Amino acid sequence: MITKPDKNKTRQKRHRRVRNKISGTAECPRLNIFRSNKNIYAQVIDDVAGVTLASASALDKEISGGTKTETAAAVGKLVAERAAEKGIKKVVFDRGGYLYHGRVQALAEAARENGLEF
């Protein structure tokens, strides 16, 4: 019998492979993305200290409704603003094993437009 591969397991495998190559420092932290069916979450992480420096999600009160792509763009803008408050300009983008398309792309472009460099 042919078994269908689990999409989330293959994504996690991709993410582990990428995480072996990418890590964030205090000078250039990692912008990590997690995407669920309804919401999207973004964190700016210093992997050396193991600390989250800034975060934003679709569940934040500042973000209003709209399509999932519009919400992702709003999350990107918000995480860029919160990172700028902490003096963070440069980050390493970690797409979390997701394809750079749709909500992930909208979040990344909004973060770039609002001052994050990656």
Curated annotation (Swiss-Prot):
What keywords tag this UniProt record?
Ribonucleoprotein, Ribosomal protein, RNA-binding, rRNA-binding
Q: One GO term of the cellular component aspect?
A: cytosolic large ribosomal subunit
Q: Which family does it belong to?
A: Belongs to the universal ribosomal protein uL18 family.
Q: What GO terms describe the biological role, i.e. biological process, of this protein?
A: translation
A single GO molecular function, which one? 5S rRNA binding
What gene name is given for the protein in this entry? rplR
Task: List the lineage, top down.
Answer: Bacteria, Bacillati, Bacillota, Bacilli, Lactobacillales
Subunit comment: Part of the 50S ribosomal subunit; part of the 5S rRNA/L5/L18/L25 subcomplex. Contacts the 5S and 23S rRNAs.
Identify this protein by name: Large ribosomal subunit protein uL18
CDD domains per the UniProt record, alphabetical: Ribosomal_L18_L5e (cd00432)
User: What is the scientific name of the source organism?
Assistant: Enterococcus faecalis (strain ATCC 700802 / V583)
A Pfam family found in this protein is: Ribosomal_L18p
